[in-house]
Amino acid sequence: MPTINQLIRKERKKAIKKSKSPALVNCPQRRGVCTRVYTTTPKKPNSALRKVAKVRLTSGFEVISYIPGEGHNLQEHSIVLIRGGRVKDLPGVKYHIIRGALDTAGVQKRNVSRSKYGAKKGKAGAAPTTGKKK
């Protein structure tokens, strides 16, 4: 613990908070162009083919972002909107592509958590096909 004299000579340093999504540059989302769309495998205990895209942002950064949901229509030169949020089992993936915005289509046949995947509401007369039973 410093003495009063030590604090007068040299004040305490403020702890610098490091951003978890630096490419967004204090914006909630950023627009970008896909430079490569591919699949990659997750870290050790998990096994899958995760869909990811390399995106060049308007802020000048080139980042790897995750494409959530089943199936997608993205290809090279697609315009996408990205948000922060990492994927725990994919090293280096700190961003998510927003489904249903710009060139990215929403997930088809999605009934639960639709707003997260840009899915439209189903037919009015159709019964909901969720996994829960009443």
From Swiss-Prot:
Keyword flag DNA repair: no
Cited Pfam families: Ribosom_S12_S23
Domain of life from the UniProt record: Bacteria
3-methylthioaspartic acid, modified sites: D89
Gene Ontology molecular-function annotations: rRNA binding; structural constituent of ribosome; tRNA binding
Keywords, in A-Z order: Methylation, Ribonucleoprotein, Ribosomal protein, RNA-binding, rRNA-binding, tRNA-binding
Assembly behavior: Part of the 30S ribosomal subunit. Contacts proteins S8 and S17. May interact with IF1 in the 30S initiation complex.
Family membership: Belongs to the universal ribosomal protein uS12 family.
HAMAP family: Ribosomal_uS12_B
Name of the protein in its database record: Small ribosomal subunit protein uS12
